[in-house]
A protein has these predicted regions:
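TRAFAC-class small GTPase G-domain
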Residues: 1-199, 203-207
């Protein structure tokens, strides 16, 4: 979904505008109506904004609020989730640092469709090793699937292999209230840093 405001600032003053290093590039994907844009603008403005379906993409710079991600800048590309737009996802995931895949935890009828798109994204050669955070959205609604159920329905273990080797984590969240969003961003940031450290170590060993 889209709010019709790209790259706009929050008006938070001089300190907020100061750079804090190179931003982490994040692609936010998921089926249409999963709540991607609501999550993006809740992270950006810390308030709920009514949105309309995204035709194309939204791009915003957001800042981590807790944990190791606190103060870290993220450049988040929220890409439309309609079926006709999904072939474009690969253009946004190329060279990205991490992926947020938003899932509607209540929409059981489309979980198989979400699984198919998640699997396709995770197994794309361009995305090999890229950390993925599955944002289990709409946890405030009755009938929302719990994390363990979603992991099973989405085939997370099938995608990632044995426990402990996973670059995919699931974070329960509610985009409207903001619950779980910054926790998820922090988790993804730690996965990104872990991957970068491992790559650096491997380069040293190869010398």
């Amino acid at each position: 979904m889209g709010a019709g405001m790209g790259r706009s600032g929050t008006g938070g003053g001089i300190l907020e505008s100061l750079p804090t290093g190179t931003p982490q590039h994040i692609a936010m994907l998921g089926l249409d109506s999963a709540g991607k844009t609501t999550a993006l603008y809740r992270l950006k403005f810390d308030q709920y904004l009514n949105t309309v379906p995204t035709i194309g993409f939204n791009c915003e710079r957001v800042r981590g609020g807790i944990g190791k991600a606190k103060g870290v800048n993220f450049l988040v590309w929220d890409v439309g989730g309609q079926e006709k737009l999904r072939p474009l996802w690969k253009s946004y995931t190329r060279c990205t640092d991490g992926i947020i895949f938003v899932v509607d935890s209540c929409d059981t009828e489309r979980l198989e469709e979400a699984k198919m798109e998640l699997t396709r994204t995770a197994r794309s050669p361009d995305n090999a090793g890229v950390p993925i955070l599955i944002l289990a959205n709409k946890q405030d609604l009755p009938g929302a699937k719990e994390v363990c159920e979603l992991e099973k329905h989405l085939g997370v273990l099938e995608i990632t292999g044995p426990p402990g080797t996973s670059c995919i984590k699931v974070q329960p969240a509610c985009a409207i209230t903001g619950e779980g969003l910054h926790e998820g961003l922090d988790t993804l940031y730690q996965l990104i840093q872990k991957r970068k450290k491992l790559a650096k170590l491997n380069r040293k060993r190869a010398r």
